[in-house]
UniProtKB/Swiss-Prot annotation:
Listed PANTHER family: LARGE RIBOSOMAL SUBUNIT PROTEIN UL13, RIBOSOMAL PROTEIN L13
GO annotation terms (biological process): negative regulation of translation; translation
Similarity comment: family membership: Belongs to the universal ribosomal protein uL13 family.
Annotated keywords: Ribonucleoprotein, Ribosomal protein
Organism (species): Nanoarchaeum equitans (strain Kin4-M)
Assembly behavior: Part of the 50S ribosomal subunit.
Tagged with keyword Ribosomal protein: yes
Signal peptide per UniProt: none
Domain of life: Archaea
Protein name in the entry: Large ribosomal subunit protein uL13
Gene3D superfamilies named in the record: Ribosomal protein L13
GO molecular function, one term: mRNA binding
InterPro entries: Ribosomal_uL13, Ribosomal_uL13_CS, Ribosomal_uL13_euk/arc, Ribosomal_uL13_sf
Length: 162
């Protein structure tokens, strides 16, 4: 597969599922994707319900047989992206190898432009990609929105990360 380039997303303040669908679409187009600040992505909904649902997923199954659900925010985000790819095919497995998810911003990516809510950091990216990532923005204009950050959810599930 020919690669079109590398995209770097800043997940801060973006809705988890919308970001994952955009990333999956760009992986299928042929981009390599890196996501920073995974712990700052949000899941909309009542925080207590979200915690309850994810705890039920993590506790489900058997220690030996699974299903195995991640607790760390970077692994949760990668698992959500995996669910939007055809992971049981060779192509899907190859696509998943082209995703890197980070907690925080690593040193090598600090100075590079990133796609996210802060448009000043997106210099150098095509206008279409910038508009696409803005679709992952939460709809705050309808009033107060209930949400939980992925880092907070992970700590509730028992993850230890910095």
């Amino acid at each position: 597969m020919e690669f079109l380039g590398e995209l770097i997303y800043d997940a801060e303040g973006l809705v988890l599922g919308r970001l994952a669908s955009i990333v999956a679409r760009n992986l299928k187009r042929g981009y390599r994707v890196k996501i920073v600040n995974a712990e700052k992505a949000i899941i909309t909904g009542d925080p207590n319900m979200v915690k309850k649902e994810w705890l039920q997923k993590v506790k489900r199954g058997d220690y030996y047989k699974g299903p195995f659900y991640p607790k760390r925010p970077d692994n949760i985000l990668k698992r959500v992206i995996r669910g939007m790819l055809p992971r049981k095919t060779a192509r899907g497995r190859e696509l998943l190898k082209n995703v890197k998810v980070y907690i925080g911003v690593p040193e090598e990516l600090k100075d590079k432009p990133k796609l996210g809510l802060n448009l000043e950091n997106a210099k150098g990216y095509p206008e279409a990609l910038i508009k696409e990532v803005l679709k992952a923005k939460p709809k705050f204009e309808r009033g107060n929105i209930k949400y939980i950050e992925l880092g907070e959810l992970s700590k509730y599930l028992g993850a230890k990360f910095t």
